[in-house]
Each structure stands twice: as structure tokens, then as C-alpha cells.
């Protein structure tokens, strides 16, 4: 599979005002919404014309292990797959069954050149308001390249799974071990 590009320049793609908000039923089990792509996205020898956006900070296809809300190390057949993990943690965006601690929204915008999924100031599930916010986005290109941009990340940064894996959970890249911080404000990586 691809490797991470070193010395990546931070490049936020602003979709505010043009993105469509996703409306999740809840923030845990099966909390994904499907987004159609106007192009085929190649990923591990398959091509997809959609992405499933999960409220817990990852995107994927085919919904294998979609109900997993607790992150862990990859590659692993017990984790969601195939998937790209931008910041997979137990996140708590606004949803139809929101608790008082839910905050932030998830938007997407697609065109022929790229697809963007934006986690806009989403909080981590803690049961407490004010636990920090995560402002990051996925960008997918028709070539199969993908990147994650992190605009402003506040709160717990060392508990997320970040990387990608194939549909069997047998191949993938974990960019950081859970327990270590990897992302920071105005940071990007691409594969």
C-alpha cells in the first residue's frame, strides 16, 4: 500500500457554506452515513463510488465491523474495514439522539476532483461538556490518493487510531500507536 508523504504541507480545503451536513441517528453502533462519489476511488485493489462516513472519525466501505466504537491497533480484522482512520476515537457529534454533551457536526462536499469530509468541532464522548474539540477533514482524490488535514485539535490527542487498512484487516498502516500523540494544529498527512 501507499506510504505517508514526508514534509507534507498543511492545506485546509474550506467547504464552509457549500458542504452538506450529515444527520446521524446516534453516535455509536452503526452510526454511519453513505455519501456518493462522482468518481471511482481505488483502495486496495477495489474501486468504490461511495464512502461510509462514521461518526467516530473514520470513513470506509462495505460496513465490516461498522458498529465498532472502541478503537485499537491496525491492521486488525476486529477493526472497521476497509477503512481510513483520520481520528478514530469515541467521538460524539450532534445526532438525532444527542445527549447534552454532544457537540459539533460533520459535513461533506464532493466534485469531480475530490471529496471532502469535515469533522467540524466534534467532541470526544466523555459524558462531560467542554472535553475539547476536534476540527479535521478527509480528502479523497480519483487517483486513489487521500489525505487528512487537522485544523484545530484540542483535548485528548493520544487515544485515537490514525491510518488505514484493507478489507481483510491483514494489510494497513498505523501512523501512531494508541497512547501516543500524532496530530497537532495545522497539520496534514497524505498517502
Where are these regions (language model features)?
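Extracytoplasmic Ser/Thr/Pro-rich, glycosylation-prone low-complexity segments
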Residues: 1-191
Amino acid at each position: 500500500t501507499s506510504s505517508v508523504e514526508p514534509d507534507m504541507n498543511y492545506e485546509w480545503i474550506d467547504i464552509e457554506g457549500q458542504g452538506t451536513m450529515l444527520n446521524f441517528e446516534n453516535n455509536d453502533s452503526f452510526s454511519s452515513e453513505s455519501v456518493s462519489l462522482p468518481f471511482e476511488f481505488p483502495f486496495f485493489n477495489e474501486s468504490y463510488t461511495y464512502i461510509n462516513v462514521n461518526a467516530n472519525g473514520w470513513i470506509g466501505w462495505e460496513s465490516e465491523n461498522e458498529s465498532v466504537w472502541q478503537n485499537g491497533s491496525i491492521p486488525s480484522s476486529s477493526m472497521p474495514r476497509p477503512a481510513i482512520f483520520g481520528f478514530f476515537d469515541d467521538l460524539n457529534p450532534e445526532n438525532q439522539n444527542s445527549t447534552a454533551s454532544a457537540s459539533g457536526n460533520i459535513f461533506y462536499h464532493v466534485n469531480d476532483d475530490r471529496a471532502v469530509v469535515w469533522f467540524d468541532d466534534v467532541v470526544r464522548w466523555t459524558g462531560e461538556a467542554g472535553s475539547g474539540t476536534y476540527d479535521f477533514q478527509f480528502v479523497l482524490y480519483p487517483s486513489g490518493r487521500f489525505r487528512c488535514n487537522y485544523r484545530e485539535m484540542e483535548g485528548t490527542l493520544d487515544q485515537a487510531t490514525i491510518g488505514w487498512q484493507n478489507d481483510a484487516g491483514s494489510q494497513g498502516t498505523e501512523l501512531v500507536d494508541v497512547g501516543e500523540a500524532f496530530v497537532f494544529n495545522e497539520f496534514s498527512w497524505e498517502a
